[in-house]
Amino acid sequence: EGTLAVITKCLLRLVPKPEASLSVLVPYADLKTGIQSVLTILRANANPTAVEFMERKVVALGERFCGVSYPRPDAGSYILLTFDGRSEEVTANAARVRSLALQNGALDFIELSDARQCADIWRVRGALVKAVEAVSEQEPVDIVVPISRTADFIRFINDLEAQSGMQMVSFGHAGDGNVH
């Protein structure tokens, strides 16, 4: 995402349709712990095809907007991941991430094997920009930071929120450092 770029080379790699797909929702007590866990997960070569992070307060906006509830409303943040590939790869990668997540402060590890629940969870995630726009005069903006600095950036946003009194929410693509 962005508007300032010069493309000098483009490579396209086609991959076959995955045999299996599994999304998981991983709640954490706070966003800092969740973001730090993402770095561990990415270093483990578990190859998630989606890695999203969301603060609880933005999830609450999405829940009201969509009329759907996330599990573990006691969580301060969530990481939403998807694994695609051969069945045995998906199972092994999810098991590896489960272990890492729980070792790194996850409150739970929820496999979204029920198609309806998975669709609802992703529908809320997909509607977060619209949910924020519905309660805000400001248009959400995208900021990209190095993945290793995402937690620092979110901390800065939270400090700015406390100082200014303006409500700010954080969510985005944890796998590439894109913060909405």
Give residue spans per PLM region.
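Noncatalytic alpha-helical scaffold of FAD-dependent oxidoreductases
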Residues: 1-180
